[in-house]
Design a protein with these regions (language model features):
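A nucleotide-sugar donor-handling region in carbohydrate enzymes
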Residues: 36-113, 268
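Donor-nucleotide binding loops and adjacent catalytic segments primarily
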Residues: 78-176
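Active-site and donor-binding regions of nucleotide-sugar-utilizing enzymes
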Residues: 1-58
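C-terminal amphipathic helix plus adjacent low-complexity
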Residues: 233-287
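A donor-sugar binding/catalytic signature common to diverse glycosyltransferases
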Residues: 1-2, 40, 166-212
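Short acidic-hydrophobic, aromatic-tinged amphipathic segments that line or gate anion-handling sites
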Residues: 42, 62-64, 161-163, 215-220
Length: 287
């Protein structure tokens, strides 16, 4: 769609450009869209600066924060008992929210082996109920989902599987979770707002700006187990509680609308080769 729009000289506004995800094929498409876009709405200062280093003019780059962060702060959450009743799982006790997707980069390892390592690590960690959601539609997703379903079926007193929680239930679960684990972007981009201890596994999100509440580890059983135990430790709790989300831009959607209403889309796109200014998602946008 972006290529067709560019060929027809239809302006493109790109949200979350400048991000890096070395373990996902999205990496290629994201940067291609950025080069075709007329205006950019990166989610954090690092991504905004990266766009300028890619040749995008600072006057076209508006660091507005993440829409996911805004959703967390504005969407009414479910009560914990309501969430418990909705899923049918014992979520009044400490629980961990787990989501794992296949890595899709050319050098990605076996998704099945990675999920098996995750399940083996979860089996050794007591004290939490594992609330597991299904994998996405990327190649290997069905295998990942089946392995996680089998784990939940084999440990019905310690784990439960839901294919999809939906946005409201997912954010509600994240709010009450003692731990978030896996390799979803939500574990990096959204958990800092909740300040929940998080384990980011493997390379799928490698390159993203990571906050203090997130521990990154390799996708092998020993590394995952060590990270899970550290994230659940009393020593890590104050570290996670100190997290300050780099994706908090305040009224992100309002900022985007303001720019779109006032931006000069008739101005020709240039390749910028100058200094990189400082960006802050908390600032008001100036067009």
């Amino acid at each position: 769609m972006a290529a067709a729009a560019a060929a027809r000289h239809i302006p493109i506004a790109h949200i979350s450009g400048g991000d890096v995800t070395l373990g996902a094929a999205d990496e290629y498409y994201r940067h291609c869209i950025s080069k075709m876009a007329a205006v950019h709405f990166p989610s954090c200062a690092d991504s905004a600066a990266r766009l300028v280093r890619m040749g995008e003019a600072p006057g076209t780059v508006f660091c507005v924060g993440g829409l996911g962060d805004e959703n967390i702060r504005t969407m009414p959450k479910m009560g914990r008992r309501e969430l418990c009743d909705s899923t049918g799982f014992p979520l009044m006790q400490p629980f961990a929210l787990v989501t794992y997707h296949p890595e899709t980069a050319p050098d990605a390892g076996s998704p099945a082996a990675q999920v098996q390592a995750l399940c083996a690590a979860m089996a050794t960690v007591d004290g939490v109920f594992w609330l597991i959601t299904g994998s996405n539609a990327d190649a290997g997703g069905e295998v990942c989902t089946r392995i996680m379903q089998d784990f939940a079926a084999a440990h019905p007193d310690r784990a439960g599987f839901v294919q999809s929680l939906g946005l409201r239930r997912y954010l509600s679960a994240m709010e009450y979770a003692a731990l978030v684990a896996g390799n979803s972007s939500s574990g990096v981009v959204e958990t800092p707002t909740f300040r929940v201890p998080t384990v980011n596994i493997g390379r799928r999100q490698a390159g993203r700006t990571v906050c203090a509440n997130v521990l990154c580890c390799d996708a092998d059983r020993a590394a995952i187990e060590a990270a899970l135990r550290k994230a659940l430790s009393k020593a890590f709790a104050p570290v996670a509680a100190s997290a300050r989300s780099p994706y908090n831009g305040g009224n992100t959607s309002e900022k985007i609308c303001t720019v779109l209403q006032n931006f000069d889309f008739a101005k020709p796109k240039i390749f910028y080769d100058g200094p990189v200014p400082e960006f802050d998602p908390q600032r008001s946008v100036l067009v």
